[in-house]
Amino acid sequence: LAMDTSFQLRAAGMQIEADRLMERKATHIPDPELILESTTGDFMTIGVQQSFDFPTVYARQKQLAQQQTILSTQASHITAAALKSKVRTAYLEWQLDIAEMRQWKTQDSLFNILSQAADRQYLAGQIDFVEKTYANLKFSEVHTQYITSLTGVQKGMQQIQLYTGTTDSIYPSELERGTGDFTFSNVVVDDDAINNTPILAYYQQSEKISEKAIQLERSKVFPDFTIGYLNPADKNTPFPLRLRFGLSVPLWFWQYGTSIKAAETKLEVARYTSSAGRQELTQQWLEAKNDALKYYEALNYFEAEGLAQANELTEASNRMFAAGQYDYIKYLTTLTDAFQVKRQYLELVRNYNQALITLQYLIGQ
């Protein structure tokens, strides 16, 4: 839906269409010149004159316009990849907001029960003021976080609705570790992946345009042609003698050399820009792949040990509190730590998935 309703993609599509129309314009010739002139001083005669560039100029202009259309197409691919990345990121953040909201809701319900129990025990003289106040304070903190998380969930849905252009209530899938066609055994740059990216293709196409521009400027060195019709004498002048033919002579050759040199300089600029773009793309790729590897290893630890230890910590603290070996302060502190571990896991899943989204964007998926 986001791809269908995107104004950016529509604009990119219209730019491609505009460039295709410019391909037709590349072979247009100048308007003819109509002449009304008295060549003999006795009568007025009508003439017409038409100028043409050397045929190679039109061919090169056509080729340059075609390459510009390809560049616009490459730009639209980048726009599409960027839009996909934005929507995926917004969707991922929404998934995280919902997962965290559920965690806060569970913690809020539990801490509410403990806060009320602490109030009753304080009134019964079973605990002191510090324990009761600490239980109330922790519940207030958690409840505030829970209310805030509800706002985040609503904001996430509005963001997705904005991207998709729908007003219907929608709900995302569960937040889970993503999968991608990437190898995380090392962080060596994948040259095949880099070489096939829309971003690099855009830079390479810019070089091709500069090369075609040089060819066009060189073709302008060739002479232009002029043909026309005008009666230069009396009314009985034979028709063949009324025709005129002209040929422009590229006498001021240094002017063409300047234009060619400028086009060659632009090609060098395009090549440097392409090299800089590749360098930046490689750096972004390495950074995203390093992040993915880092979060991948962290998730393996949490799924193998961290989450299980958090659950064991919660169960042990429940037993200790029920047996009277933990007071409210120690019990609530332990529960808070256990819930925090679970939220850290959710954030790791988000960070790992975000690294995959970045890698997908860089290769145009």
Question: Predicted regions span which residues?
Answer:
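Glycine-centered coil turns and helix-coil junctions that link the paired helices
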Residues: 54-55, 121-124, 253, 320
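Short helix-capping/hinge motifs at transmembrane helix termini and TM-loop junctions
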Residues: 125, 165-166, 223, 324, ...
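Short flexible linkers and secondary-structure junctions
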Residues: 1-93, 100, 105, 129, ...
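Amphipathic alpha-helical coiled-coil segments
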Residues: 12-26, 79, 83-104, 112-115, ...
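A small-residue-enriched
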Residues: 1-54, 192-261, 265-271, 283, ...
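Periplasmic alpha-helical coiled-coil/stalk elements that build and connect Gram-negative outer-membrane
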Residues: 82-198, 288-291, 295
